Amino acid sequence: MSLKDYLRQSISKDLEVRHRDSLKIRLGERHPLSVHQHMIAARQIIKSDNAEQQHVISSLSGFLDKQKSFLRVQQKALKQLEKLDVDEIIDTAAEVKAVSNDIKETLITSTELE
């Protein structure tokens, strides 16, 4: 249920309750119109409560769906991290360091030759 429907039901409930209270004051609690309006207001209160619950449920459902997709992405990233081999990372870092040292030495020797 949309927020618009929920608000519509809530406003309708407030109007029916006000009308019920007004009739109760003007005509008395036991007057047939007051009793009838009391039943209408009770029905509208139930509709409004149901609309509120449906809105909360749909909002929570949407939030949980977003969280579920976010957690799936996080889980995939975690699985990829688990697949990485720590020794392989260390070996790669050592190779990069060795290559950078070789480049450094080459630059030093080339500047000395000039």
Swiss-Prot record:
It holds the Pfam family DUF2664. InterPro entries: Herpesvirus_UL96. Belongs to the herpesviridae UL96 family. This is Protein U68. It comes from Human herpesvirus 6A (strain Uganda-1102). The lineage of its organism: Viruses, Duplodnaviria, Heunggongvirae, Peploviricota, Herviviricetes.
